[in-house]
């Protein structure tokens, strides 16, 4: 019992003489270093951060925070570059689209111009064809009339009386007044009266 008391007394003596003053010195030294701007905890934090169990308990150091911040800045810069590239690509596509619309409008205008030219040419061709047909028909009528002009009035009267009324009127209208009178005189009174009325009506 007395041996245990002696050991306990020795431990207290060591605690009071060595450990407590040493702890006081460490605390005082840490305060002085902290006041001088020296981070006395950094070496301890770095050592603890390398220990598998303790690294979860140690807060992030300035280096880690700086690295994380640098990584975030790098990611932000990459995203901004991607956004800028996408906007540039959109701008290029919009310009291409505007160019395509302009080209389409130009082609449509050209097509309309060609269609109008083709329509005008077709109309001109039709007018020319109609004019040629009318000229040809008129020429043929003149030939027929000239035949009846040179024919005997009695014979001409018999033939004209057998023709369709429209054809007969064309021939009679093309004759001179003397030739017309001679031919009508060779027709029956009924025929002469009918053709006289038709000729008078056509000349009104």
Curated annotation (Swiss-Prot):
Please list the GO biological process terms of this entry. bacterial-type flagellum organization
Q: Keyword Magnesium, does the record have it?
A: no
**Which residue intervals make up region (Disordered)?**
115-140
Q: Name one Pfam family in it.
A: MgtE_N
**Lineage: superkingdom:** Bacteria
Instruction: Name the InterPro entries on file.
Output: Mg_transptr_MgtE_intracell_dom (IPR006668), MgtE_N_sf (IPR038076)
The entry's keywords: Bacterial flagellum biogenesis
Please state what the protein is called: FlaA locus 22.9 kDa protein
Give the organism the record lists: Bacillus subtilis (strain 168)
């Amino acid at each position: 019992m007395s041996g245990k008391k002696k050991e306990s007394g020795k431990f207290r003596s060591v605690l009071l003489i060595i450990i407590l003053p040493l702890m006081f010195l460490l605390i005082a030294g840490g305060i002085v270093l902290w006041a001088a701007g020296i981070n006395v905890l950094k070496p301890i934090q770095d050592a603890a951060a390398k220990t598998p169990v303790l690294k979860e308990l140690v807060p992030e150091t300035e280096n880690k925070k700086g690295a994380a911040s640098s990584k975030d800045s790098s990611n932000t810069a990459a995203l901004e570059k991607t956004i800028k590239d996408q906007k540039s690509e959109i701008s290029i596509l919009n310009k291409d689209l505007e160019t395509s619309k302009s080209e389409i409008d130009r082609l449509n205008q050209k097509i309309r111009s060609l269609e109008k030219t083709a329509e005008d040419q077709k109309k001109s061709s039709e007018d020319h064809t109609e004019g040629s047909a009318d000229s040809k028909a008129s020429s043929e009528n003149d030939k027929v009339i000239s035949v009846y002009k040179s024919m005997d009035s009695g014979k001409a009267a018999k033939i004209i009386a057998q023709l369709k009324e429209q054809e007969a009127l064309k021939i009679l209208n093309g004759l001179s007044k003397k030739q017309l009178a001679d031919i009508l005189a060779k027709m029956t009174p009924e025929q002469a009266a009918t053709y006289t009325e038709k000729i008078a009506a056509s000349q009104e």
